């Protein structure tokens, strides 16, 4: 089990970012600095859990449009284009905001609402498994898988 191989860790702080192309982009929380433990966790999840993902469909490939060679390779190999070296951890906060004025207002509102959150560390202590029946349905949580703790790690050593 992937989760049992990790101890809880912290992302030192988060920043608010607008990711993607302007009209199709979205606001998200992203790590303020690179977090190696987060990268190790992502790689373990992608590689060790690949057998459990749904098969890649032709429409999934078409939907991605123009991808770099690395992203296209990731898509065919792992089922998603932004994994491994292309991975960027983010917590999505909004949908796409086409109107530039509204985008600026939403950004200002989020910065104000998140003042205490952006400087605080984010503790990562579990993986949560989600499923989606189809592209038109929301994701639903299936299971929360806690990381090991120091006592468990010492017992295994």
Language-model features: where?
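Histidine-dependent nucleotide/RNA phosphoesterase domain, centered on the 2H-phosphoesterase fold
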Residues: 1-157
């Amino acid at each position: 089990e992937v989760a049992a191989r990790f101890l809880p860790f912290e992302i030192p702080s988060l920043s608010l970012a607008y990711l993607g192309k302007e009209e199709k982009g979205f606001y998200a929380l992203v790590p303020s600095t690179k977090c190696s433990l987060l990268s190790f966790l992502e790689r373990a999840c992608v590689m060790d859990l690949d057998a459990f993902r749904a098969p890649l469909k032709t429409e999934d490939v078409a939907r991605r449009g123009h991808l770099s060679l690395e992203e296209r390779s990731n898509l065919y190999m792992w089922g998603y284009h932004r994994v491994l070296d292309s991975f960027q951890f983010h917590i999505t906060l909004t949908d796409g905001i086409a109107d530039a004025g509204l985008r600026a207002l939403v950004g200002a509102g989020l910065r104000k609402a998140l003042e205490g959150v952006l400087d605080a560390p984010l503790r990562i202590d579990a993986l949560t498994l989600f499923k989606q029946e189809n592209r038109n349905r929301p994701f639903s949580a299936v299971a929360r898988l806690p990381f090991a703790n120091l006592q468990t790690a010492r017992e295994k050593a």
